[in-house]
Design a protein with these regions (language model features):
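Residues lining the SAM
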Residues: 105-107
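Conserved class I S-adenosyl-L-methionine
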Residues: 1-37, 39-45
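A short acidic, Gly/Pro-enriched loop at the edge of an enzyme's catalytic core
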Residues: 94-101
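A short glycine-rich, Lys/Arg-flanked "PGG" loop and its adjoining helix->strand segment in the class I
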Residues: 119-131
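Class I SAM-dependent methyltransferase SAM/SAH-binding core
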Residues: 49-93
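C-terminal lobe and adjacent flexible extensions of AdoMet/dcAdoMet transferase-like proteins
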Residues: 205-251
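SAM-dependent methyltransferase
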Residues: 136-211
Length: 251
């Protein structure tokens, strides 16, 4: 189930305005198109469709999937959205396909707190890729302890959202236990005083844990690189579905 910050229609409608700097996606476009030469991509956790549309603008065939219907509805209303296949649901609901690349941007990979959900997602993505296809995603490095900066004082912002009026939001950590950070993201619409609460949880898995999960789900980890726009804070993982399945008993 998607968090209210993505699933509530009023919040989804202002998401892009509150998070307007998406220069982080330039890194993904360079990897997906320039480095891997992808012609078909499935964007897992596509949200309001910013990255999917960026890829479509460069001629890529894109499928965007997300469990937050309100966010996908925002994506569907954007200019050029008709070029993209939008799917409501999680990766396990992907239709049969043979994509060149699958992506999880914006730390989508961390929302799978439960190991079972994480494994089923990776296996579903593996099945959606053609042999030789790649999965590209990011995850915050737990040793950077990013959550220590998630306080109301450090994150509060008030944004002019045009006809909607001023919208205020912030992030505040509730707890950190067993690699899982729980935090609140209140949003206030100044025009009518409406306040929406949203509580989210993110899993800060170690690099070793993520690589082991990828391997267990049939991927070959081809590269783990420092995120160029956030050095020392995030890893970008590249994993490939092998061209040929491993022989039984092979190690």
């Amino acid at each position: 189930v998607a968090d209210p910050i993505f699933a509530e229609p009023r919040l989804a409608a202002v998401y892009d305005l509150l998070d307007s700097d998406r220069s982080d996606l330039d890194v993904y476009a360079a990897i997906v198109i320039d480095e891997l030469g992808a012609r078909s991509v499935v964007d897992v956790g596509c949200g309001t469709g910013t990255f999917a549309l960026l890829l479509a603008d460069r001629g890529v065939d894109v499928t965007g999937i997300d469990p937050a219907r309100a966010s996908v509805d925002v994506a569907r209303r954007k200019h050029g959205a008709h070029r993209i296949r939008w799917v409501d649901g999680d990766a396990t609901g992907l239709p049969p396909m043979q994509a060149d690349v699958a992506t999880m941007t914006a730390n989508v990979a961390q929302v799978f707190v439960d190991d079972g959900a994480w494994t089923s997602t990776l296996r579903a993505i593996h099945a959606a890729l053609r042999p030789g296809g790649h999965l590209v995603f990011e995850a915050r490095r737990p040793e950077a302890r990013a959550w220590e900066e998630w306080t109301k004082d450090a994150t509060r912002q008030v944004v002019d959202c045009g006809e909607i009026g001023l919208v205020e939001e912030w992030v505040d950590v509730v707890s950190f236990e067993d690699d899982v950070v729980e935090f609140e993201s209140p949003t206030i619409f100044h025009a009518d005083g409406a306040r929406f609460e949203s509580t989210s949880r993110l899993r800060f898995r170690s690099r070793e844990s993520i690589e082991a999960a990828l391997t267990a789900c049939g991927f070959v980890v081809t590269d783990v690189r420092d995120a160029p726009d956030r050095p020392g804070r995030e890893w970008i993982y590249l994993a490939q579905r092998p061209e040929h399945p491993a022989a039984p008993g092979a190690s």
